[in-house]
Amino acid sequence: MSGKIHRYLAGDHERLDTLLERAMPDPENIDAAVYAEFRAGLLKHIGIEEKVLFPAARQQRGGEALPLAAKLRLDHGALTALLVPSPTTPIVAAIRAILRVHNTIEEDAGGAYEQCEELIGAEIDRILLEMRNFPYVKGLPHVDNPFVMDATRRAIARAGYELEV
C-alpha cells in the first residue's frame, strides 16, 4: 500500500538523499550550504515522525507504541547525534548507512508508514496537513569535541550499528 502519508514521507526521503548526494559528491568535498539544508530537512523529517505520525498511531493503538517504533527511535537518536559534529567523510558514510536500513523499515510493505496509515484511517488528511505544516527545527552550530564524538558513537551502537566515525 502506498497511501498519502507513505508518498509524502518517502518523497521526503528521496529529497533528503538527493541533498546529501549534492552536499558530498566526492569524499574530499563537502558543500556546507547544501549539507546545512540536508541537516535541517532531516531534523524536520524526524520531528514529523516523532511528534506527529508516531503519536497519532499510538493513540489509535490505545496508547501502545508501534512495534517498530523503538527501533526507529534508536535510529533517530543515532542520526541526530551524527548531525551534531561537523560533517566528515566517515560521518556522512554513517548517515547513509543508517538511512539505507531505516528508510527500508519505514517504506517497505508492512513497514511503519503502512502501519500508521492503516491505524490513522479517516484522520489521514488531518495528520498529513499537520505534517506539511510542521516547522523546521532551529539548527545549532556544529560541535566538534571528544565528548560529542563519544556520545555519537554510543548512540550509533545503541541503535545496533557498527560504524566508524
Q: Where in the sequence are the language-model features?
A:
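Small-residue-biased structural context
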Residues: 1-165
